[in-house]
Amino acid sequence: MADDDTVKGLAVEAESSRTDDTELTPQEQRRVIRRVDARLIVMLGFLHTVSLIDRGNLSTAAVAGMEKELHLQGNQYNVIAVVFFPPYICLQMLGPVLIRKLGPKLFLAGICFIWGVSMMCGGFVHNWAQLAGIRIIIGALEAGFFPAAVYLIATWYTRYQMQKRFAIFYLLGCVASAFTGFLSYGITFMNGLGGLTAWRWIFVIQGLITCTLAAISYFVLINFPDRMRSSKSRFLSHREYDFITDQINADRGDVRLEPFNLKKYLVAALDINIWGFGLVYFCTTTTAYSIAYFLPLIYREGMGFSMGASLCLFAPPYVAAGITMFATSWIGDKYRIRGPIIVFNAMLALIGLPLMTFTKGNGPRLVGCFLTTMGANSNVPAAMAYQANNVRGQWKRAACSAIFVGLGASGGMVGSLVFRSQDAPEYRPGMLTCIGMQAAAIVLVGLLTIRLYLRNCRVDRGELVIGDLPGFRYTY
């Protein structure tokens, strides 16, 4: 937990505020934050929706006949799923740099539009190798989105406004992408239209949706707060921009962007805390991606549901996850805690995974699907806030976002590999891997809590200054 004096009165939600400096009333402050939320969080949430859909629609396409038409054998499905991740991981560090150089409108809208076109091309492949190639291209393009979006969000808010925003950002994508099961089921009725089978239409239509949202985002997204203040934008008044920048400077003192220095950018990798936060995220995404990629197959092969039921049952666990995600994020921001939230969510998954693995009958296994989806996905914004709250400095924040998301993508690669076709219908090795990952996340949070607590004690004794900002304390 961080020292309250460091951030006292900064969150708009708090009763006290810096109205004496900004000349904004509390009501005006809340209105400013809501306007930023609407233009930034909601738009990024919709872009995140299509990114999740476009990387995770393999399972719905497989259920809709892709495996049969492309004559997939052995681990070819796993290969198609996993080739997304090497470029996605290797190119993470470029996203935060390029969004600063090109601006959010051009960079985020541009890569989103191109990967949408690539997704549409997936509807016209003739073999699994061509589809794998398209997945590589999509992985390279999506690599820039998530770390850049996380970095952009973190520059607009104080530390104890972040988790709710990260939750909304991820929740929109999580819940909306879950309902693609219904969309995919509807698309299956287009089977044969225009000479394309149902699974091909899934790729074409979802790619078209991506391109449309990318075009809209170009006109909606806002720039970094330090750039918006000096631009001709009428989105906020100068007084309102001053409120935003003043509260961030008082919270962590890093509104001003330092000149880019490659050495300083890369030296962030030497901070052991960043790797600890990233490993928590790695454990989280291993389970979250596993569920996203294989839940429809588990429904159909493991529980015996029909194709339509398997696609439609994909959504309800994610709706429950969205509720859990926002509730735990609200608690985390209100009480300024991070680690306990992650432990609670991991425990939900640790209850759900054994129910999915070791019980008989669809009732207990469905309960397990809900608990696992709730716990794993709720920990995504929790882990993001855990990392973002404990980093200061613009370029360090940018580098740490890339490392953090890269480790999360590595978890996705593991999740796509451990559920092997030869292990169907129970997928026990994959389930056991996810159980181990959730247990490891709890252990990592415990170790990080001890480390951050001890370093805060050194700050209290005047022995340490964190991030060159006197009075800054870690949040745990």
Model regions: which residues?
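Central mid-sequence intracellular linker of multi-pass
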Residues: 159-173, 192-270, 429, 434-471, ...
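Helix-breaking motifs and short loop linkers at transmembrane-helix boundaries and internal kinks
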Residues: 54, 70-71, 94, 102-103, ...
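Cytosolic juxtamembrane N-terminal segment immediately preceding the first transmembrane helix
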Residues: 1-58, 68
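Conserved MFS/SLC helix-loop-helix module at the cytosolic interface between two early adjacent transmembrane helices
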Residues: 90-129
